[in-house]
Amino acid sequence: FKVKVSIELHPSVSRDIERTLHYGRRYFKVCPEFFIVKVPLTPEGYLAVRKLTQENIPINFTLGFSARQNYLAARLSNPDFVNVFLGRLNQVVIDHEAGSGDQVGEKVTLSTQSALIEAREKYKDVQSKLIGASIRNGAQVAFLAGLDVLTIPPKAIKEFQESGKATNEVISRLNEEIVPGINNSHPLAKRFPCLWEMPGQFISFVDDLMNENGLDEMQGNELVDFCRKHGMNLFHDFTDTELKQIYDHGKIPCLDNWSESIALDDLMTQSALQSFTKDQNA
């Protein structure tokens, strides 16, 4: 069809910078006119994407679940695209009976879009655009109007087309205060705000990281250590046993099984990565 398509690297290379670079370059050479290389969000992924982007290889940095993950990606790695898998964020609330789940993923997505717009305006080298991924219905298509990119399955676009919404009803909600469908009295409620919040402390952390010498030579473990020293819980050190537990459970984690010290965005990303690994191993 002569259209651009994202070609995802195998998850087995996701924690290896050199292999990510090797296969990223190799995939791109197959069809440079239309291939966008899809790289999963890991410490090594951030650093490999930084290099691939500098080589003008188009990148879709996937498996993002929060504004802060994607803001860091835009500043540090500057991929062409970042993602929020919003449907899964709504579902994790529903699965835990922590609320209706309405507009949870939408709030995260719009917060991410705002953060990226701010980054693009302040830092002229930042060009990353947001993909609203995991769209489930036509209402979400309308609610997220004005987003950089939406990936919409046929069922959802048909619902939108048949909704009868007038053109003047389809407006940008970037500056609106979105109230997510989370029961604030639920024991798990406090685990969700990290998905959409962008505190000044986090922006200062990213500023400090960008001022580090040798970013292009940084290794994944060094990025993890830098985050920990700055009090950022972006990358939990999952044991092999924990990874197997995530692998067996599926895309939506059972939050009751995991310490509150593990950030929800990190847990969702790892669950998505292990789920993709399982699919590839089938």
Walk through the language-model features, giving the residues of each.
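Catalytic alpha/beta core domains of metabolic enzymes, predominantly
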Residues: 60, 65-211
